């Protein structure tokens, strides 16, 4: 089945969608697509068929999101923990991924028409090399599209993502691109796999399980969490509407306020750190007792500007390193 399932909503679906759109709408929804194996057991089919039906439901859900004006979707496709499953199931999932990413490369016209940028987030080194190459082709082919975004978390856990971001910052310090004092929560944000995306407004988990399973733990601290009992392959447009309605009724205004307060708290902490560093600098230079407010402001501005220059240089180097790795995959089989 296609990644992009085209088609319009029914008359009744459009009517309800328009009612929803009268309220605050999420810009970014994340899904834990749980229940494929239970669906297969329920329908007395092979597990692989359950996973295949789960992919078909993803294509349908992306169409609903597009029709509702939700322009960014992140899905938990394969956890690093899933490698602990039986070899036959893991091999089947890798084969399914090969089929779907190969199909993706055949759908360039649809992707271009809808402006869909595909990002694959996770430790791709853990995947078979041929699958890495297919993923790299898909990411490169769609990287300049910007109407809507699909983030596929594959070989991913949040703990792995955060520890990788810490390693990237340590690399920046080792390379002389950063000072140890440049390391902060804000910089860690920019080193995550999701650095180009806003935090999800809603995180939806299907199948009735009430846990996050190590998915987007850093990014969802202020997200609306919705746990729904339906198995993923049986997910419907109405389940999605229910989740959006929960967001509108309980969370949307508080969410933005909480994010603004948290951002302000980060800025305040950074200012306090900068003020302490300037005080130490003036003390070393024998100017602490001068009490010159203009001098302190000048020093603060210079300190902030130098840090921002280092951080931007580091982030550019990090982007280049990641892009070079993807480009290298494209030439592996050549």
What are these regions (language model features)?
Residues 1-334:
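Flexible, compositionally biased loop and terminal segments
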């Amino acid at each position: 089945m296609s990644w992009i399932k085209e088609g319009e909503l029914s008359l009744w679906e459009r009517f309800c969608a328009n009612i929803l759109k009268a309220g605050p709408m999420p810009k970014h929804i994340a899904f834990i697509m749980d229940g494929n194996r239970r669906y297969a057991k329920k329908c007395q089919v092979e597990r692989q068929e359950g996973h295949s039906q789960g992919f078909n439901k993803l294509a349908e859900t992306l169409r609903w999101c597009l029709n509702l004006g939700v322009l960014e979707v992140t899905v938990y496709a394969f956890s690093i923990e899933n490698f602990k499953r039986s070899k036959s199931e893991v091999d089947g999932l890798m084969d399914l991924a090969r089929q779907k990413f190969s199909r993706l490369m055949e759908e360039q016209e649809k992707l271009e028409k809808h402006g869909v940028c595909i990002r694959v987030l996770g430790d791709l080194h853990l995947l078979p090399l041929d699958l890495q190459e297919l993923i790299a082709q898909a990411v490169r082919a769609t990287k300049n599209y910007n109407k809507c975004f699909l983030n596929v978390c594959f070989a991913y856990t949040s703990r792995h993502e955060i520890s990788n971001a810490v390693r990237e910052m340590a690399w920046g310090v080792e390379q002389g691109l950063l000072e140890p004092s440049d390391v902060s929560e804000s910089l860690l944000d920019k080193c995550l796999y999701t650095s180009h995306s806003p935090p999800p407004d809603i995180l939806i988990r299907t199948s009735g399980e009430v846990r996050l399973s190590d998915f987007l733990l850093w990014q969802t601290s202020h997200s609306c969490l919705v746990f729904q009992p339906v198995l993923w392959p049986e997910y419907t447009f109405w389940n999605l509407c229910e989740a959006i309605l929960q967001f509108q009724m309980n969370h949307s205004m508080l969410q933005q306020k909480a994010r603004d307060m948290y951002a302000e708290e980060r800025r305040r902490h950074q200012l306090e750190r900068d003020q302490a560093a300037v005080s130490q600098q003036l003390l070393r230079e024998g100017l602490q007792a001068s009490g010159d407010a203009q001098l302190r402001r000048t020093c603060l501005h210079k300190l902030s500007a130098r840090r921002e220059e280092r951080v931007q240089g580091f982030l550019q180097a990090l982007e280049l390193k990641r892009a070079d790795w993807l480009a290298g995959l494209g030439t592996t089989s050549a």
